[in-house]
Each structure stands twice: as structure tokens, then as C-alpha cells.
């Protein structure tokens, strides 16, 4: 069981990145918000980075804008970047669940099963708010589980959720 606990985060990363590739293929075929967030087919010559410094969905555009305009990163790289960002939230959630499970093997198994639910990985691996909001949500849960009701991290996570949503 100890070996699994050590390797599982790496397997979880591979699993999460697999969903980034699946999400990329899905958006290429079915289209979606990710195309808008990555400014596909849009002329950015008259746009400024500061134009997107607003709460809500513009937060995603604010983060994507320099990657597209200044670095000319391809569409697939957005999925990789947002997926890696959201994986930080997945990892926080996994560690929180493992800490809560303690030495209870059944709870460890349940936590592993929960961490493998496809929806958690698919929606948070796309370019969008879901990827960004996962970190503050999991930080919020981790802080509550530790009974840190007024910590700086908890308050910052609430602020981040408010800005992103």
C-alpha cells in the first residue's frame, strides 16, 4: 500500500494529462469555450492585455492572452498548461483525502476511486474556469478539514473563487 501511495500521484498526473489530450480532441471536433478563451480565429492586434483584467470569464482570457499574443503558443499547449494548473488542485484534493482517511484502508480505497472519476479530470483539463477554480476550491476544503476557518489561505481561496466566477 505504501508503494501505491508513492506512485499514485504520478499515475494520477498521467491520467489527468490523458484527459487533457481527450479534451483537446473533443474541442477540435465539437468546438467549445476553449476556442474563445484561446482567441482562435480572432485578431488580437487591437487588443491589450489590460482589456481582460475583469472578474469572471475574462480571468481566463487575461491568463491566456500573453501566451497567445506574445508567445504564439499553439492551441494544444493551452490544454497542457491549464491541465497542469488544475492538477495542482487534484493533488491538493488527493492529499487532503488521504490525510482525512488516516489509517483506514477502506477510506484510502474510496479516496483513490473518487480521484479516478473521469469528470474531475475531463472538465478541469480544458482551457477554462474549471481548471482555474479547482485550486482555490481544494485549498478551501483542505483548510476547512484542518479547522483553519480564518486562515489567509482560506480567505485567499474565497477571493480567488469570487474573481474567477
Give the residues covered by each predicted segment.
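Transmembrane and membrane-interface helices of multi-pass
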Residues: 108-118
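Transmembrane-helix motifs of polytopic, lipid-linked glycan transferases
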Residues: 80-101
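Start-transfer (signal-anchor) and selected internal transmembrane alpha helices
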Residues: 1-18
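Extracytoplasmic catalytic/substrate-binding loops of multi-pass membrane glycan-assembly enzymes
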Residues: 26-40, 49-64, 72-73
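Membrane-interface transmembrane helices that cradle and orient dolichyl/undecaprenyl
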Residues: 100-101, 138-151
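Transmembrane helices and adjacent periplasmic/lumenal helix-loop junctions
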Residues: 131, 156-165
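Residue-level hotspots within the lipid-embedded alpha helices of multi-pass solute transporters
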Residues: 53-54, 82-87, 162-163
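Short acidic/glycine- and proline-prone juxtamembrane loop motifs at membrane-interface regions
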Residues: 125-130
Amino acid at each position: 500500500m505504501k508503494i501505491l501511495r508513492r506512485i499514485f500521484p504520478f499515475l494520477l498526473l498521467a491520467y489527468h494529462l490523458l484527459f487533457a489530450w481527450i479534451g483537446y480532441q473533443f474541442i477540435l471536433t465539437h468546438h467549445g469555450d476553449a476556442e474563445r478563451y484561446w482567441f482562435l480565429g480572432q485578431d488580437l492586434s487591437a487588443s491589450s492585455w489590460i482589456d481582460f483584467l475583469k472578474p469572471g470569464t475574462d480571468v481566463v482570457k487575461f491568463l491566456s492572452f500573453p501566451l497567445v499574443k506574445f508567445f504564439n503558443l499553439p492551441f494544444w499547449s493551452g490544454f497542457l498548461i491549464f491541465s497542469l494548473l488544475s492538477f495542482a488542485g487534484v493533488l491538493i484534493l488527493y492529499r487532503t483525502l488521504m490525510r482525512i482517511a488516516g489509517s483506514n484502508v477502506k477510506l484510502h480505497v474510496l479516496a483513490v476511486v473518487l480521484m479516478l472519476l473521469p469528470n474531475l479530470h475531463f472538465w478541469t483539463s480544458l482551457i477554462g474556469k474549471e481548471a482555474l477554480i479547482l485550486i482555490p476550491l481544494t485549498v478551501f476544503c483542505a483548510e476547512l478539514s484542518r479547522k483553519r476557518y480564518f486562515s489567509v489561505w482560506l480567505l485567499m481561496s474565497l477571493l480567488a473563487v469570487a474573481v474567477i466566477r
